[in-house]
Structure formats: structure tokens, C-alpha cells
């Protein structure tokens, strides 16, 4: 990869045309009204992509992201869809295609994290988690394979929890994400006929509202109600870079994967944790 290409992918770029490598590209990002999805959309928008900002219920946060993207020169829209429902996923892609005419990048980010003692998991809770985290991502990938332009990109979202050991009461969530890693490897094969790549990200230690609610579980000796700064300090010490991650960190990784230079990365699960556990 050339130095100039690396600069374009990884820097905080101004919105000038010479630094907009994704101008003319369209990215559909599920669950992008907040958190990691929002961070991905903003990084893609900085680089010229038009974004479909998906939300499940409230349009407020999604519309705020659209407004932020407009300031960056990105012509984006907010579309509602409950990703746990395959019919909603199909309709989301159809609406996006009707608006833009094509989709180049599909980033499946919607998800939920739960902690529940295994003996207390009900069939209803199991279905709720797997319908969103697992089945939803399968049908995002399926529709992306059907509708994305040749040479496009599909990115699914796993979690470092899928490979971690020693975390109690986490089988339901970890299992829902581990399945996604299998999807990425298999879809990469089937997407090859359209030169579409498929990879999965396994983020860890990324500060979002979900992080604020749940990260105490990952800190040795952590407890509910623990001061968030204490949690951040504890997790930072578990990372060689001595910090927690941000949604922008994941957004920049996505920009690398969807770039022309990222084509040879395919069927992989990328652990995105700054080297931390």
C-alpha cells in the first residue's frame, strides 16, 4: 500500500475533493444512529461516501447523524428497519436502492449485549438476542450479496467476546457473535462471483453507551455502579496502547477494508481491540 493511500485511509481528513476517495460510493450501515455505527458513518462520510443511517425505533439520533454528515458534504438519509425482522432488512435494501440506485458497502452493526446466568436464559430471551445479533446479520449479508454492486464490501460485526474465556454469564451473547464469524468466512466464498469481499470485525473496549452500561463486567473486581472513569482506567491498563477505543477507531478500520487497497482481506475476523484482551 502506498504512503498516500495509507494517509487517505487513516487520517482525519478535511472534506476537500482530493481527500474523498469514496465519492460516489453508497454505504448502508445498520444500527448507525449511535455508538460504533455512528462512528463508522462519520468516517465514511468524511471520505465522500453517501450513507444510509438505519435506526430501529426513534429517528431522532439517526437524523442528527444525517445532519452531521451533511456538514461533511455527505448526502445521506435515515431509514427505519428492525434488523431482527428479515422482511424489514429486505425492505431497507429496496428503499436504499430506490433512493441511490446502487449500494457499494454494507456494514452490519446492529446488535445487543446481554448478561444472564445460563440457568436463567429463557427461550424468549434466546430468540431476542439471536434474532438481532445472528439472524439479522445473516439476512443483511444475504441482501448485500443480492444487491451490492460488483466489487462491493460486506462487513459484519462480531465481538472479542466470541473468543474470550473466563467471562461468566455471557454464553448467550458470545454464542450469538461466534456464529457471525462463521458467516463471514462462508459468505466470502459465495460473494466471490461478484468480487465482493466479506469480513467481520470483533471490537473490544470501545466506549459507547453500551460500554458505559456493561464494561464493568470485563474489569477484574468490577461491579455494577462502578465509576466509569475507574472502569476506563482498568480497561486501559489491559491494552498495550493504554487507552480504550472510540467509535472512530472502528470507523477508520472500516474505511481501510472498503477501500480498493483492502480487497485482499477477505473472509477474515479482525480483532479490533488495540491489542487488549
UniProtKB/Swiss-Prot annotation:
One of its GO terms (molecular function) is tetrahydroxynaphthalene reductase activity. Induction: Expression is positively regulazed by the cluster-specific transcription factor pfmaF. PROSITE patterns: ADH_SHORT (PS00061). The keyword Oxidoreductase applies. NADP(+) binds at residues 36, 82, 109, 173, 177, 206, 208. Disruption phenotype: Abolishes the production of scytalone. Pfam families: adh_short_C2. This is Tetrahydroxynaphthalene reductase PfmaG. It comes from Pestalotiopsis fici (strain W106-1 / CGMCC3.15140).
Amino acid at each position: 500500500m502506498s504512503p498516500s493511500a495509507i494517509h487517505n485511509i487513516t487520517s482525519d481528513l478535511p472534506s476537500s475533493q482530493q481527500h474523498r476517495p469514496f465519492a460516489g460510493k453508497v454505504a448502508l450501515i445498520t444500527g448507525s444512529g449511535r455508538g460504533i455505527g455512528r462512528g463508522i458513518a462519520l468516517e465514511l462520510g468524511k471520505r465522500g461516501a453517501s450513507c444510509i443511517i438505519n435506526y430501529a425505533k426513534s429517528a431522532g439520533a439517526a437524523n442528527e447523524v444525517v445532519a452531521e454528515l451533511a456538514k461533511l458534504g455527505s448526502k445521506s438519509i435515515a431509514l427505519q428497519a428492525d434488523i431482527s425482522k428479515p422482511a424489514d432488512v429486505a425492505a431497507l435494501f429496496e428503499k436504499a436502492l430506490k433512493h441511490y440506485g446502487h449500494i457499494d458497502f454494507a456494514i452490519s452493526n446492529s446488535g445487543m449485549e446481554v448478561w444472564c446466568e445460563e440457568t436463567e436464559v429463557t427461550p424468549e430471551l434466546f430468540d431476542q438476542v439471536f434474532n438481532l445479533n445472528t439472524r439479522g446479520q445473516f439476512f443483511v449479508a444475504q441482501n448485500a450479496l443480492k444487491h451490492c454492486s460488483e466489487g462491493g464490501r460486506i462487513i459484519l460485526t462480531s465481538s472479542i467476546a466470541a473468543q474470550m474465556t473466563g467471562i461468566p454469564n455471557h454464553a448467550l451473547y458470545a454464542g450469538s457473535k461466534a456464529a457471525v464469524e462463521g458467516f463471514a468466512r462462508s459468505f466470502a466464498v459465495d460473494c466471490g462471483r461478484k468480487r465482493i469481499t466479506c469480513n467481520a470485525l470483533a471490537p473490544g473496549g470501545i466506549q459507547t453507551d453500551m460500554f458505559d452500561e456493561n464494561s464493568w463486567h470485563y474489569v477484574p473486581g468490577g461491579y455494577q455502579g462502578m465509576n466509569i472513569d475507574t472502569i476506563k482506567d482498568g480497561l486501559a491498563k489491559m491494552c498495550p496502547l493504554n487507552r480504550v477505543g472510540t467509535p472512530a477507531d472502528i470507523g477508520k478500520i472500516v474505511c481501510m477494508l472498503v477501500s480498493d487497497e483492502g480487497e485482499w482481506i477477505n473472509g477474515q475476523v479482525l480483532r479490533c481491540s488495540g491489542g487488549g484482551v
